[in-house]
Amino acid sequence: MSPRWAKRIGALALFALMGAAQAVDTGVKCPNGQPADGVLHVGSERHCLVMRLIEPAQAQTQVLAVFMHGDNSGRSELRTDRGNAFTLADKLRVSTVALLRPGYQSELGRSDGYNLGRDDDYTAGNVEVVATALAQLRQLHPGKKLLLVGHSGGAAMTGLVAARFPQSADAYLLAACPCDVPPWREWRQSSAGRGGFWPNSLSPLAEAPKVPVSTRIALIVGSQDDNTLPRFSEAYVARL
């Protein structure tokens, strides 16, 4: 690991050592009339995302973690008793938002945005929807550092937010990112018969030059990951 990446990962850890802040209600209403209160919905009058705020006991940080799930998931990530968002909140002891990505459906409702069968949805429009939601979360949690964490497809979206709306978060963590979308789709076709070109999706690798050099961003991927191969993350890091 290069010193640059070690420094960035260290910055993520430092965020977890700060104290907590209070949320503020902005009174924004979602398109469905529900309040964008930072508890079950967040966004703007144009589009809102469904969310679940997980508050671990004795959370003593000034960090708000936001977790974006991968493709073909989302439902389990809105639970308060298990799932990746719950684990993140529990391990870091920080308030954590489980964010339902644009177009996804859950028991709490459907997030606004485009979703074609939970495929080919890393679109410019969806990236903007996420950035709008993050901007409102900042308003609802003044004084907190915002850590955006994405897994798999959520990691791809996280990388795209970092490129197109870099002020959306104070730090970014991409886990198992399919960061080079066209080769990843080819790989999924050959390895699992689940490929097909995604004409509507942006590729984080292509957008990487837009990420400001000062951005705190880190990637993690398992050496045995047979879906989002390590080389897709490595290629992205090399482009930053």
Could you tell me what each predicted segment is?
Residues 2-10:
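Bacterial N-terminal signal peptides that target proteins for export
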Residues 18-21:
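N-terminal signal peptide c-region/cleavage motif recognized by signal peptidases
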Residues 24-57:
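N-terminal cap/lid segment of alpha/beta-hydrolase-fold proteins
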Residues 48, 55-94, 98:
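Short, surface-exposed "cap/lid" segments of acyl-processing enzymes
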Residues 100-124:
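Cap/lid segment of the alpha/beta-hydrolase catalytic domain
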Residues 116-140:
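Alpha/beta-hydrolase active-site loop
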Residues 145-191:
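Primarily recognizes the serine-hydrolase "nucleophile elbow" in alpha/beta-hydrolase
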Residues 181-240:
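The feature captures the conserved acid-bearing segment of alpha/beta-hydrolase catalytic domains
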